Amino acid sequence: MNAAPSRPDTSRGAPKSPLREHVAQSVRRYLRDLDGSDADDVYEIVLREMEIPLFVEVLNHCEGNQSRAAAMLGIHRATLRKKLKEYGLT
């Protein structure tokens, strides 16, 4: 019996360009736009700029259910609640 050749999973509508590449492009653009200015908190900036829309979109997807959103994110609900409060999203 011949096995079917493996194919990329397109059942979920996988994006043509991986998320990682979008993030890399955004970071490159941000660093270029610094135009020689010093920045000593790029890590925190990137985390904040990624987490805020991530939390908003996952919560919307889960119809505001924080327990489901936390499970989908793979974090504890208390961590999600702490982050939402930290970002003023509550």
From Swiss-Prot:
Region (Disordered): 1-22
DNA-binding region extent: 66-85
InterPro entries per record: Fis_DNA-bd, Homeodomain-like_sf, HTH_Fis, Trans_regulatory_Fis
Stored Gene3D superfamilies: Homeodomain-like (1.10.10.60)
Record flagged with keyword DNA-binding: yes
Biological process annotations from GO: regulation of DNA-templated transcription
Molecular function in Gene Ontology: sequence-specific DNA binding
Domain of life where this protein originates: Bacteria
Keyword set, alphabetical order: DNA-binding
Keyword DNA-binding: yes
Family: Belongs to the transcriptional regulatory Fis family.
Protein name, per record: Putative Fis-like DNA-binding protein
Organism for this UniProt entry: Xanthomonas axonopodis pv. citri (strain 306)
